[in-house]
Regions:
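Long, hydrophobic/aromatic-enriched structural stretches that serve as scaffold segments
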Residues: 58-121
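Short capping loops/turns at secondary-structure boundaries
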Residues: 99-102, 106, 133, 150, ...
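Short, solvent-exposed helix-helix connector turns and helix-capping sites enriched
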Residues: 49, 102, 126-127
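Predominantly late transmembrane helices and immediately cytosolic-facing juxtamembrane segments
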Residues: 124-128, 132
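Secondary-shell segments that build the walls of catalytic and ion/ligand-binding clefts
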Residues: 1-71, 136-271
């Protein structure tokens, strides 16, 4: 780093600088000392060479290899493939966190992964019609976040959104949850006439996806993300187990959805 951009003569001068060489020598010694101590610092971790880690990485790498060839990162063209891309990367991130001994972070990320699997499950089951509605709510979110430059277009979006909300009996205070969860009204799995169904994740997305058995797991992961006492005083080994089991549970369902989707739309045969 010190010699970057310097010519040979300047590099030779650096080699004569004893103070600099001593400083570099100290840094190198500290680096190797820290590397030596690293296994002790992360005693509660999943080894990257363990079957638990390597199996998950192998499954995810194969899915990523297939998906990366067809995913365009354009929701109007490859919405489901884009969502699979994010899910795969989130799952790989959880594996890396477990390797580093970041059990709390891994379990907190499982929460995001579970949210994503519920959403993609409903969107695949709902087909093109539901996916179009979901895309519309992405536009609503962009308008709400003032990400659309055309003010007239933004105004028209809000007029349309407010009309839809009024039709559903929602008030202005419900706008944020309508933007995020309003697409559920178009899902056959969401019963808007049943008071048990609500516009949120737990009583909306999760319930409609028929994965409510994970609500307790989700709640525990939510506590971790809010720096509750669980975050400060949790036992690392406990959350390593939860994150690992949770990851493989999601991975089993996601892998099944992924290959069925790819086969149904002939994606695998196109590669």
């Amino acid at each position: 780093h010190v010699s970057y951009g310097k010519n040979d003569e300047e590099r030779n001068d650096l080699l004569e600088n004893k103070a600099l060489l001593n400083s570099i020598s100290t840094l190198v010694s500290e680096k190797f000392l820290l590397i030596n101590l690293r296994p002790q610092a992360f005693q509660s971790h999943v080894s990257s060479f363990s079957p638990v880690s390597s199996t998950a990485e192998a499954i995810l790498s194969k899915m990523d290899l297939i998906n990366s060839k067809v995913c365009k990162h354009d929701p109007t063209k490859t919405l489901i493939l884009d969502l699979f891309d994010r899910i795969i990367k989130e799952a790989i991130g959880i594996v890396k966190m477990l390797n580093l001994g970041l059990a709390n972070d891994a379990y907190g990320s499982w929460r995001t992964l579970h949210e994503a699997e519920c959403i993609i499950k409903l969107l695949i089951e709902g087909g093109d019609d539901l996916q179009r509605v979901y895309l519309k709510h992405i536009v609503y979110n962009n308008a709400f976040r003032e990400a659309i430059e055309d003010k007239d277009a933004t105004d028209q979006i809000f007029i349309q959104m407010k009309a839809e909300m009024k039709n559903k009996g929602l008030k202005s205070k419900d706008m944020k949850k309508y933007i995020e969860y309003g697409w559920l009204y178009s899902s056959n799995s969401f019963d808007s006439t049943n008071p048990a169904f609500k516009l949120n994740f737990r009583d909306g997305v999760q319930k409609a996806a028929k994965l409510s058995k994970y609500s307790v797991w989700y709640e525990a992961a939510s506590e971790l993300s809010h720096s509750s006492p669980v975050f400060f005083y949790s036992r690392e080994e406990y959350f390593i187990e939860l994150a690992t089991i949770g990851l493989y549970d999601v991975l089993e369902r996601i892998e099944d959805m992924f290959y069925k989707y790819m086969e149904r739309y002939g994606v695998i045969t196109q590669i």
